[in-house]
Amino acid sequence: MNKFKLIVTTPERVLISGEVSRVLCKNAVGEFEILAGHQPYLTATVPTVTRIDDENGESKYLFTSTGLMKVQNNEVTFCVNSAEWPEEIDEARAMNAKQRAEERLKNKTDELDKKRAKLALARAMSRLKLKEM
């Protein structure tokens, strides 16, 4: 199976740095897939559950937040604001964040507040989705 190097990093730590066979992620346009030999590509990511298939084809799942993803020379680098493995997610905290975001969306009329609340809701929903997997 063809493989490539994947690095997922946040301002605090590196979550993964190793060989993988596939990455499935999401940007503002929709879901996309990266395989070995992918053309150079740069995109902004949105909060989602990112699927990582290791070199044996086994899948791992990771919450990735907003950030950038770069593909170049058979290497994929995620620089995201936050990322968590399923066992690191605090489900109660994510539920509280979801409820706060939904309340903010109901009560705020300011566009900036709406955008922030939608982003917070997307982060919370992605974390909860991953926790349920």
UniProtKB/Swiss-Prot annotation:
Cellular component GO terms held in the UniProt record: plasma membrane; proton-transporting ATP synthase complex
Pfam hit, one: ATP-synt_DE_N
Presence of the UniProt keyword Ion transport in the record: yes
Subcellular location: Cell membrane
Membrane-topology descriptor: Peripheral membrane protein
Coiled coil stretches, renumbered: none
Gene3D superfamilies, A to Z: ATP synthase delta/epsilon subunit, C-terminal domain, F0F1 ATP synthase delta/epsilon subunit, N-terminal
Keywords: ATP synthesis, Cell membrane, CF(1), Hydrogen ion transport, Ion transport, Membrane, Transport
Signal peptide feature range: none
Domain of life: Bacteria
Record NCBIfam families: ATP_synt_epsi (TIGR01216), PRK13450.1 (NF009984)
Family that this chain belongs to: Belongs to the ATPase epsilon chain family.
Known function: Produces ATP from ADP in the presence of a proton gradient across the membrane.
PANTHER family noted in UniProt: ATP SYNTHASE DELTA/EPSILON CHAIN (PTHR13822), ATP SYNTHASE EPSILON CHAIN, CHLOROPLASTIC (PTHR13822:SF10)
Protein's recorded name: ATP synthase epsilon chain
Organism: Clostridium perfringens (strain SM101 / Type A)
